[in-house]
Amino acid sequence: MGRSKSSSRWLNEHHSDVYVKKSKEDGFRSRASYKLIELDRQDKLLRPGMTVIDLGAAPGGWSQVVADVVGDQGKVVACDLLSMDSIAGVTFFQGDFTEDEMLDAILNEVNSRPVDLVISDMAPNMSGMKSVDIPKAMYLVELALDLACRVLKKNGCFVAKVFQGEGFDQILQESRGRFSSVNIRKPDASRARSREIYLVAKGFRG
């Protein structure tokens, strides 16, 4: 069975992608690492000793960046539906974040430790139908924001992949009510044709 036009286009883009090549050279597991590196450079999100929760972590590009910065005194708790090879300094749970069991596992691992940053690169399996995909994606953002508001320390930060469409304005308004600063970013490492953007919320009001 031949490849579809869309899958062939993705493969061509992937092989010619400067960030894919750079990730291999720098030892990162995915090009997504550079999205977080750029967001951190712009918004100063990471520092040594932080406690960070990474949602939608596999294959581990963001967790690698975070673990490298927070160091031995920090703590990184990650989860994903997909499996992920271990990363030094990262506690990983494989499972469905929309299920209470996974939420409980994350909360137990954090164990009342104040969380400095919640990051989410979660996205649903895309069908190509915006009317289906966008609500699913924004539901994941809503769950991630709920967790952030539950565990973040005062002045903590939240970063999430979002998609413009149904539910976006509501998430933006909700975030602005809970954080002192909310910005929308489109990192250079995000593919130009991708609808993904990143919500960066700083200064959790508690």
Swiss-Prot record:
The keyword Disulfide bond does not apply. The active site is at K161 (proton acceptor). It comes from Hahella chejuensis (strain KCTC 2396). It catalyses: uridine(2552) in 23S rRNA + S-adenosyl-L-methionine = 2'-O-methyluridine(2552) in 23S rRNA + S-adenosyl-L-homocysteine + H(+). Belongs to the class I-like SAM-binding methyltransferase superfamily. RNA methyltransferase RlmE family. It comes from the Bacteria. The keyword S-adenosyl-L-methionine applies. It is found in: Cytoplasm. S-adenosyl-L-methionine binds at G60, W62, D80, D96, D121. This is Ribosomal RNA large subunit methyltransferase E. Its EC number is 2.1.1.166. Specifically methylates the uridine in position 2552 of 23S rRNA at the 2'-O position of the ribose in the fully assembled 50S ribosomal subunit. GO terms for molecular function: rRNA (uridine-2'-O-)-methyltransferase activity. It holds the Pfam family FtsJ. Signal peptide: none annotated. GO terms for cellular component: cytoplasm. Keywords: Cytoplasm, Methyltransferase, rRNA processing, S-adenosyl-L-methionine, Transferase. InterPro entries: RNA_methyltr_RlmE (IPR050082), RNA_MeTrfase_FtsJ_dom (IPR002877), rRNA-MeTfrase_E (IPR015507), SAM-dependent_MTases_sf (IPR029063). PANTHER family: RIBOSOMAL RNA METHYLTRANSFERASE, RRNA METHYLTRANSFERASE 2, MITOCHONDRIAL.
